[in-house]
Amino acid sequence: MLDTEIPQTHLSSKLEVGIGISADPNPDAAIAEAAGLAGRRLGSATPDFALVVTAGSVARDAVGTLREVLGQISVAGGAATALLTDHGPSREGALVVCVANADGAASGVAATAGRNLCEAGQAAARLVLAGWPFRARYPRGLAFAFARPDGGDAAQTFLASWRDFMGPKMRTVCTVLGGAAAYGRGAAEPLASVVSVEAPYASGIGYTDATPTDGVTPTAETLVHGAADAMLTAVKRLEGRPPRLVVAIESAARLRMLGSALSEEWAAMRGALDEHTPCIGWVGEHVAAYGRGVQPTDAPGALIVVTLGDAPR
């Protein structure tokens, strides 16, 4: 069963982002609280879509709960291992990111099932593209995908099948959820949930991992330096435009390797940003991406930083 939503957009002159976080251990209650916060932070802007990520128990009705607060909004997301915020990691609660597109942008959301993740990735791309009849041959923009595990290389499998249809210009990050649920409307248990934005927004992806050097596993200090470099790379891609949103997505293996140094890693990444720039993230079983300077790999201890800013004037 497949589902996609292409909203009728109330466009604003610039990209607007509202973020809400709740530590309520009840995931549905946490989604409602976080959605309310995110909606209020958007002010008068009308959100086009929302990302919802939970930690701890899986939400019973993530989409329905969020829509009770924000109305008939398109939703993508999933249940992660932990949430990452300026207050430290959280093993329970919810994160909601609401986005109101700028003039000329279009967003599409799809939740897909299938016999395997390859089919789900192809179906998601077809559905999103079908809602963009005005699209260029290869749409340009940014996408966030959430996939349930389906084999040992789930992220690469999704990204390869998605890219076959979407083309090379849609920068895409895929979080593998470690057996937990992907959230979206349509399929009862979707294998994949994805939101994609076609727009000339400035965006950047920074990457680092924990691949051993000469057989030696990186130390926590090395991992912290790698994370700071990934953040600097992602910010540099914006070419001087201030980031509206910064997302750090960490693999569970990296979280284990860091141990108590996780707070140092977050501080190192945060140090590359203005204190008022919103920065959030989550932990998945694995994470991979393709985009400018980044290719999907199965390297251990991956960390991906994504930045999103206004389009050039």
Protein language model features and the residues they cover:
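Hydrophobic alpha/beta core scaffold segments
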Residues: L2-R313
